[in-house]
Amino acid sequence: MKNKILTFLVAAIPLFALACQKSKTTDTSAKVDPPGEKVKYFKNPVINGDHADPYVAQRDGSYYFLATKGGNIAIAKTRAMSQLNLANETVVWTPPENTDHSVDLWAPELHFLSGKWYIYFAAAQRGVNDSNRMFVLENDNADPTQGEWTFKGKIFDAANDEWAIDGSILTIADKNYFVWSGWENANEKYKQYIYIAPMLNPWTLSGPRVKISSPTNDWEKWEPSFLGAGVNEGPIALQRDANSPIFVIFSASRYSSDNYCLAQIELKKDGNPLMPEDWINKKQVFTKSDKNMVFGPGHNGFFTSSSTNDKGEQQTENWFIYHARNMPNNPNQPRTSRIQKLTWNNDGSPNFGSATSTGVNIPCPIDEQ
């Protein structure tokens, strides 16, 4: 199935979200290289409205933002992440009716593999409970907001064709693996695990799924008001550089809980990603902040920002994007997309810091300074 692309403006930017303008108050100014220049600021959320399950891809100086739309898949393209709210959003694909992927299009991710763009997304059959599965689209245009997206089909383990969402790509030594969140079987509904499988090509698995994370801790089992079966979802790969440890960052507990959070598992040195025992060091890494009114932070993506200083040295920052709510005990409140800088611990593990309040000045990514 191929779809022509439609483009429209995301939303008018409000007065309070003037992204990365020079600060007008001297008390919030800071120095950057070269000395004497004022830092530019932005405020979260970086885009208006409900944008759950945010994801960012980047290539050739452009950032591509995706989030759950439900009925279609759209991409917003920008050169500056702090100005995402000004970006044009392009609807790149709308599913046909009466298929196994016609509704509930969730958590799309955009990846550039083997010279082409691929979108991985969850979807379901209208009127059929628990029919959520993962699917793949392909586009050979250099710009994923242009050209045609071709439906490649369902990506799944044929021996274990179970409920599946939140698919992503993990690449190790030029080999791609598919990671996702799913059920063990239909008799154990609503308990979500993280699975991994090797890939034959960008739309086909070459081996059976392997479970690499199970919700065993209380912090992985929060529903809005009680402990449930447990949820691990939204897996995404993270590695500082080729000599650093490999992590899968995932979201834990039910998305509607204030205690929804980010967590990690780490592939041990020289470990086999298809061996469950080689995934170690599970722990929470980013949680709610009652003080800063950030609740249910999770389902994140990553991007980098780079700039060359006047000495010819390249400086690179790591950032993450995530969704959260700004009111407690309100599971139906829209989830907004926010970005924060990611730093690193001495052992190569990520340091997400604390969740930052909305509406406060945050220095822009370095490529915007």
Residues covered by each model-derived region:
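Carbohydrate-active catalytic/glycan-binding domains of CAZyme proteins
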Residues: C20-Q369
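Bacterial Sec-dependent N-terminal signal peptides
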Residues: M1-V32
